[in-house]
Amino acid sequence: MLRSFHAELQKAHRRHDLLLCLLVPLIMILWVGGLAPSDPEELANGYSALLYSLPVIEAILMPVMMAVLASRLWDMEIKGNTAKLLYTLQSRRSLFAGKAVFGVLEVLLVTVLELACVPVLGRVHGYTEAFPTGQLVYLFICTLAVDTMLFFGEFLLMLWVGNPLPALCVGIVGALVGLFSAFMPPLASYFVPFGYYIPLSAYEVANWDQATHTVTYGTRPFNWGLLAFTLALGAVLFALAWRKVQDEEV
């Protein structure tokens, strides 16, 4: 497994995967940075507004990002038709484990870099609201769970089809459907895994003053049930991907 992981690390270095992992935090900084609050009342709700907006941004960006990472993880085996050759040179378990571990670490890197921008933006914009450590930790766990679930879903699709293009197309369509799920009834959004970032969010709009155009944010209880279902769904997709590799003929 270590040899397979080292090989994935070398391939990722040549593909410049680190730059790809930096893309999402960069887009988020540019996106949110352009909406920098200046009113003292907005600064007092700065972190709440940011943590309310982040799941919506994730529902737009992350399905595509996970599809790109998953497709790049197996692209050389598909383009060069070398998967069957690799199965004869090393065990399928070590090959799959190396790729799975490397993929999860890439997902973890993207999630850490993205949410590390929260205190940075708060510092730069001068938020006066107390830093919500517990809410940020919960958002990190939820984001990582949904990212990993989508990653293995796209990876499984690519293994089934033998082509990275359908996975990318599903990621793009999933981003649109996930965004639309934000405007669906709460129950309907539970049937759209691409948009789980939004129902898992602990922030909601408590009040909007139409006269002053000010928004007051509130929190709701953590959605542990949906988080557990997301983790279970990710585990099922991982197991199906491993079974597909096991059953593939040489």
Regions found by a protein language model. Name each.
Residues 1-6, 73-86, 151-178:
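Cytoplasmic juxtamembrane interface segments
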Residues 1-24:
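Aromatic- and glycine-rich beta-strand/loop motifs that create alpha-glucan
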Residues 18, 24-70, 100-164, 171, ...:
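Secretory targeting signals
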Residues 21-22, 59-60, 189-190, 195:
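Hydrophobic alpha-helical transmembrane segments of integral membrane proteins
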Residues 35, 40-49, 168, 173-250:
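Terminal transmembrane helical anchor/hairpin motif
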Residues 65-78, 154-165, 229-247:
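Transmembrane alpha-helical segments in integral membrane proteins
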Residues 71-105:
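Helix-loop-helix units of permease transmembrane domains in multi-pass membrane transporters
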